[in-house]
Design a protein with these regions (language model features):
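N-terminal Rossmann-like NAD(P)+-binding subdomain of aldehyde/semialdehyde dehydrogenases
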Residues: 2-107, 135, 275
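Conserved C-terminal structural/oligomerization subdomain of aldehyde/semialdehyde dehydrogenase
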Residues: 3, 33, 317-318, 322-457
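ALDH superfamily catalytic-core signature
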Residues: 5, 12-14, 206-334, 361, ...
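Rossmann-like NAD(P) dinucleotide-binding subdomain of oxidoreductase/dehydrogenase enzymes
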Residues: 97-236
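Glycine/threonine-rich beta-strand-loop-alpha-helix active-site module
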Residues: 158, 531-645
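Carboxylate- and glycine-rich phosphate/diphosphate-binding segment that chelates Mg2+/Mn2+
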Residues: 267, 275, 613-725
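ATP/NTP phosphate-donor binding region
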Residues: 459-547, 821-822
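Gly/Pro-rich interdomain helix-loop hinge
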Residues: 740-743, 747-831
């Protein structure tokens, strides 16, 4: 069989050859992508070792070819690019599973990007090639290098060193490659066909990378200003800047381009620069050098990476051979000043600043004109002048802000600061037109896949810390105010009816017996208003209670909760507190901590609302008529006292409305998306007791103490259930029916209950609940469970639910509740005119979110219509 001819070109000098090479590399990279972390780390170490060993010949090659820089400094660069990069990533995981949390069901997996196009500059050819090839090997990417034409030989040689070592250690052949005869056409082709671009070079090249249509990681122009504050260590500052500026003849893009000195120390700084071998140009010499720095609006390439004496000679200026840095004392920071530009050579501009503010202003201008996003530097007393460091950091639009650090070495990382990532590609963020604002490294060259397994939301069961039950328990429970808590001052909240009819007397008698001072606020309205609550809170502030006792139905207990909030936190905003939430634990608004001033006790006098054990309260703004439903566990009473003796004389209408309200609480809690085994038992037992004992309470409550107590306990259990499972769209619609047409809340729930049961029972709902805690629509089966628990029978779930609906309707009729909204709102035209607004507000009600079926506007509207006319002519 004939041997297959190798069609991969060995010399890349045409678009066709490059395209073929990229295709071959993609195949090699697919193999490389299957390597384990152990295999990759072996290759990474071998490649770094080879580059490290070749640091001197590669440095010589770079200087010989480009005619720029200093061999000894390029040796350090090559050493940094191999040793420091290896050290930074030797133990970093870049293959397979990066992290996994089985409890949360989260796993993060690293995948390589593919083939990386690497643009290499002439200023740092070998070190940048080493850096980029190493990070690509560590991340299992292939890399094709586009060298600068003036540095192609040394760049390619560096890449060869890394490639040979990598292949010898097991890497696929051809995983690193390069363009042999670089051109703009080939570079553009490479950028268009690669998977990602790692660009280091001039602004034009970086812009081309970002305009290629491929993801790019680039750098920006540097124009680093260094401020020397009057509190700085002058020796440290001057010699650090010289150390930085002379390194490789100033070719690191983070090197200082200007030094800004406060006038108080200007002469001392200048003297130190001179003493350390820097040359200050006079006015005539400064002008000559100006014309040499910038030619035709661009940096003169002939000065880049040259010695000061060479640059001076180009300008026709004679200086000592050993001069370290040329310094031009200038005033303008405008772009028209040549010294204000990036110079990439041992040439510095020096400015005198009036003070620190003036220095920062000058630095801001220099950065804005040529160095957005790159690097800035400050020399200051870092111990005693933290405010100046903070001010500098706040105002510099640079991604590296260096303090008391030579910027060439400090900017590339892991030198002078060991948490700054080592890199030879320095991101400049959006300010510099980049996609990254940090030193580029391995994390930027991998795609991270996140595997997220389904987890159910954490649920809970919360109740008052103390719930006391049984007839006659109230005085015994109140005894704790003295014996256990040592309370001194009690504030009673109730309504005028209960106050006038002596309901508060057993409480005040007990308080008198215990020697606890008290006062009573008895102005709670049936729909408690904000102004009423504010009056109560004002009375509390004057009285300064350490205990609040709310006695009454839902209105008194809700009003008491609001007064409690206003008493302890008068700064609260009710609109913020009433904000809707999807998850009560993740809401935007954080409720203030309650109970720091007063202990809250709720004592119900009716069986229905459950407010004594819930974290809910409703308050009405008397000016706008807007009801603010508040929900937060901070509103949960600390103690609930459910003593049926307080409910014995409840009128029939209240008994019926509150009893059916409790039925709706239990049914909605059982059907809720947030229902749990803990709430289910309470809901079911509550329903059992109400169906059994509510008729007797309604008929002859005063003479049925057992029935009264059972219904009272049922209402509280239903309250506990919905305090944790929450309610649903029945309550959403009832709230608005009451608000728009003044239908009592319990009656409104009763009128909507059948429609909601039918709506929720749909096996093919238009929409499931949002973030449901169930895996499929199952509310029909849930309602059937209720029916069977109540002994209602049924051959199947559908029949059982029909039996449940009939039982609910029969109970409503038994306690005198009419069958349709029209019976309570006879003005049909008014009802229909307000229906759309009522529908929208019901949809937006806080209770809607926990409904097992997510309702659409049209579905809510149809339920209202069905309930209004008392029929089910159109299903929803």
């Amino acid at each position: 069989m004939a041997k297959k001819e190798n069609t991969i070109p060995t010399i890349i000098d045409t678009p066709e050859a490059l395209t073929a090479k990229i295709a071959a590399m993609k195949e090699a990279q697919k193999i490389f992508a299957t390597f384990t972390q152990e295999q990759v780390d072996k290759i990474f170490k071998a490649a770094a070792t080879a580059a490290d060993k070749a640091r001197i010949p590669l440095a010589k090659d770079a200087v010989e070819e480009t005619g720029m820089g200093i061999v000894e400094d390029k040796v350090i660069k090559n050493h940094f690019a191999s040793e420091y990069i290896y050290n930074a990533y030797r133990n970093v995981k870049t293959c397979g599973v990066l992290e996994e949390d089985k409890a949360y069901g989260i796993k993060k997996i690293a995948e390589p990007i593919g083939v990386i196009a690497a643009v290499i500059p002439t200023t740092n050819p070998t070190s940048t090639a080493i850096f980029k090839t190493l990070v690509c090997l560590k991340t299992r990417n292939g890399i094709i290098i586009s060298p600068h034409p003036r540095a192609k030989k040394s760049t390619i040689e560096a890449a060869k060193v890394v490639l040979e070592a990598a292949v010898k250690a097991g890497a696929p052949e051809g995983i690193i490659s390069w363009i042999d005869i670089p051109s703009l056409e080939l570079t553009n082709t490479l950028m268009q066909e690669a998977d990602c671009i790692l660009a280091t070079g001039g602004p034009g090249m970086v812009k081309a990378a970002y305009s290629s249509g491929k993801p790019a990681l680039g750098v920006g122009a540097g124009n680093t200003p260094a401020i020397i504050d009057e509190t700085a260590d002058i020796l440290l500052a001057v010699n650090s800047i010289i150390h930085s500026k002379t390194f490789d003849n100033g070719m690191i893009c983070a090197s200082e381009q200007s030094v800004i000195v406060e006038k108080k120390i200007y002469s001392k700084v200048k003297k130190e620069f001179k003493a350390r071998g820097c040359y200050f140009l006079n006015e005539e010499e400064t002008e000559k050098v100006r014309k040499t720095i910038i030619i035709n609006g661009a940096l003169n390439a002939k000065i880049v990476g040259q010695k000061p004496v060479t640059i001076a000679a180009l300008a026709g200026v004679t200086i000592p051979e050993e001069t370290k840095v040329l310094i031009g004392e200038v005033e303008s920071v405008d772009i028209s000043e040549e010294f204000a530009h990036e110079k990439l050579s041992p040439v510095l501009a020096m400015y005198k600043a009036e003070d620190f503010e003036d220095a920062i202003a000058k630095a801001e201008h220099l950065i804005a004109d040529g160095g957005y996003g790159h690097t800035s530097s400050l020399y200051v007393d870092a111990v005693n002048e933290r405010a100046k460091i903070d001010e500098f950091a706040s105002r510099m639009k640079t991604c590296r802000i260096l303090v008391n650090t030579p910027s060439s070495q400090g900017g590339i990382g892991d030198l002078y600061n060991f948490k700054l990532t080592p890199s030879l590609t320095l991101g400049c963020g959006s300010w510099g037109g980049n996609s990254v604002s940090e030193n580029v490294g391995c994390k930027h060259l991998i795609n991270i896949k996140t595997v997220a397994e389904r987890r159910e939301n954490m649920l809970w069961f919360r109740a008052p810390e103390k719930v006391y039950i049984k007839r006659g328990c109230m005085p015994v429970a109140l005894q704790e105010l003295k014996d256990v808590m040592g309370k001194k001052r009690a504030f009673i909240v109730t309504d005028s009816f209960l106050y006038k009819n002596g309901y508060t007397k057993p409480i005040t008698d007990k308080l008198d017996e215990m020697g606890i001072t008290y006062t009573t606020f008895a102005d709670v309205e049936p729909d408690p208003s904000l102004i009423s609550a504010q009056k109560g809170a004002e009375a509390m502030r004057k009285f300064e209670p350490d205990c609040i006792i709310a006695l009454g139905g839902g209105s008194a207990m809700d009003a008491g909760k609001i007064m409690w909030v206003l008493y302890e936190h008068p700064e609260v905003d009710f609109q913020d507190m009433a904000m809707r939430f999807c998850d009560i634990r993740k809401r935007v608004y954080t409720f203030p901590k309650m109970g720091e001033k007063a202990y809250f006790i709720a004592i119900p006098t009716s069986s229905g609302t459950g407010s004594e054990v819930t974290p809910f309260a409703v308050i009405t703004d008397q000016n706008t008529g807007v009801k603010y439903p508040l929900a937060d566990y901070q509103l949960m009473p600390k103690m609930a006292i459910v003593d049926a003796n307080n409910m014995m004389s409840g009128p029939k209408g209240l008994t019926a409305a509150s009893g059916i309200d409790a039925v709706s609480h239990a049914l909605e809690a059982y059907a809720s998306m947030m229902a749990t085994d803990f709430t289910d038992g309470l809901a079911l037992r509550s329903l059992k007791l109400i169906f059994e004992y509510l008729p007797a309470c309604y008929d002859n409550g005063m003479n049925e103490p057992v029935a009264r107590e059972k219904v009272a306990h049922a209402a509280t259990m239903a309250g506990m259930a919905f305090a944790n499972a929450f309610l649903g769209v029945c309550h959403s619609m009832a709230h608005k029916l009451g608000a728009f047409h003044h239908v009592p809340h319990g009656i409104a729930n009763a009128l909507m209950l059948e429609q909601v049961i039918r709506f929720n029972s749909a096996e093919v709902p238009a929409k499931m609940g949002t973030f449901p805690q169930y895996d499929h629509p199952h509310t029909l089966a849930r309602y059937a469970e209720v029916a069977r628990y109540l002994g209602l029978g049924g051959k199947n779930d559908t029949e059982s639910v029909e039996n449940l609906i009939k039982a609910v309707n029969d109970l409503k009729a038994r306690v005198g509740i009419k069958s349709s909204i029209k019976d309570y709102v006879p003005d049909e035209e008014d009802f229909l005119n307000r229906l759309d607004a009522m529908t929208e507000q019901a949809f937006d009600d806080q209770c809607t979110g926990a409904n097992p079926r997510y309702p659409l506007f049209k579905e809510i509207k149809q339920m209202y219509l069905n309930a209004y006319y008392g029929n089910n002519s159109e299903t929803v």
